[in-house]
A protein has these predicted regions:
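Secretory targeting and sorting signals
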Residues: 3-31
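C-terminal region of N-terminal signal peptides and the immediate post-cleavage residues
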Residues: 24-50, 54-58
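Functionally critical loop-and-helix segments that line ligand-binding/catalytic clefts
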Residues: 50-82, 87-88, 242-328
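Substrate-binding cleft of extracellular glycoside hydrolase catalytic domains
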Residues: 57-210, 220
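Glycine-rich, charge-decorated loop segments at or immediately adjacent to ligand/cofactor-binding or catalytic sites
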Residues: 139-146, 234-246
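Aromatic-lined carbohydrate-recognition surfaces of secreted/lumenal glycan-active proteins
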Residues: 219-240
Length: 328
């Protein structure tokens, strides 16, 4: 087969990469680790950085560099929007560690609206985004079956976050609410919306009914894809249910799963190091504080396989459904 033309500079860049990789491999195992694991990681980092330099010189893509970086993208989430100036400073600071941020939609168990209307501002700053919808939770209680009148009163109250609202019917209704809110914020079709499911020692069937119906409704509607934020303690069971819903809907994709667990966390690890191959995001530091650009924020720290966890894998030509037609 004929070889594609390669510019002389590209050939020299490739030779440089190969040369450095060869030197690193020649060093073999080192005292940094009995099996050379740390050394091999450093070799990969060096080679990836060289590939980036070569890409900049030649104008070509650097898949090795991209693969090395895309699997370990640090991000953070915090309850209340920190403000435009803070977000700009955190993104522009030299050596700024975070590439993406959680974007909270108004939802039953997160009624704060401080993030509303900030999508384009954050995108313009260069932030990746993870859309979060905090649905109904158990809060350590066993859900009770309510009358239609009592259910309506809870839904219309100023505090519509209640374990007794964990039903399939409420899951569908909250899914429509999530679709409408995501569309209103201007997120493109097939963006992933992460349903926040907090830790449960024992998961009641009512919770499975709720998130199952929520997931099914998003898949059925088709404008956005369902993802899930879940604690490691419940992750396998939730993943199995959500994966089954994808299969039943004929959606040949892996659901995006965001797993929370502080155990074994170190910056530099990949999401899958939380203990599940299906984990695409890992929240490893919870209720902490970090300082960037001399500005301190309360936050959780995460690592993601994607620079922007809610971005669809492939650009879509699906038309955006206006919010007033979401239920159709």
């Amino acid at each position: 087969m004929a070889q594609p033309f390669r510019h002389p500079i590209a050939r020299r860049a490739a030779a440089l990469i190969i040369g450095i990789a060869g030197i690193a491999m020649a060093c073999g195992r080192s005292s940094t680790g009995p099996d050379g694991d740390q050394t091999n990681s450093e070799i990969a980092n060096v080679a990836a950085n060289v590939a980036q330099v070569a890409a900049a010189v030649t104008g070509q893509k650097a898949p090795m560099a991209n693969a090395q970086q895309q699997g370990k993208n640090l991000g953070f989430d915090t309850h209340t929007y920190p403000g435009d100036k803070t977000m700009a400073a955190w993104k522009a600071a030299p050596g700024a560690p975070y590439r993406w941020v959680g974007y909270y939609l108004p939802s039953p168990c997160h009624t704060d609206r401080s993030w509303t209307g900030k999508r384009q501002t954050l995108v313009d700053m260069g932030w990746g985004l993870a859309v979060v919808y905090v649905g109904q939770q158990t809060w350590g209680r066993t859900p009770r079956k309510l009358s239609p009148e009592r259910t309506a009163a809870l839904v219309n109250s100023k505090k519509p976050c209640n374990a007794d609202l964990l039903t399939a019917e409420r899951g569908r209704a909250d899914a429509d609410d999530a679709i409408e809110a995501t569309a209103r914020e201007g997120f493109p079709p097939r963006s992933i919306v992460f349903l926040d499911i907090e830790r449960m020692e024992k998961m009641p069937q009512a919770m499975r009914d709720y998130y199952g119906a929520w997931t099914k409704r998003l898949l059925e509607h088709g404008q956005y894809r369902p993802g899930v934020y879940v604690h490691k303690h419940n992750a396998q069971a939730v993943y199995d249910d959500v994966k089954a819903a994808f299969f039943a809907a004929g959606v040949d994709e892996e659901p995006r799963i965001w797993v929370a667990s502080g155990r074994g966390w170190e910056e530099g690890k990949a999401p899958q190091d939380v203990g599940f191959a299906f984990a695409g995001v890992w929240q490893g530091v919870i209720d902490a504080a970090r300082t960037v650009a001399d500005i301190k924020l309360p936050l959780d720290v995460n690592v993601s396989s994607w620079i922007s966890p809610s971005d669809p894998e492939v650009p879509s030509d699906i038309p955006v459904v206006p919010p007033d037609r979401v239920g159709e």
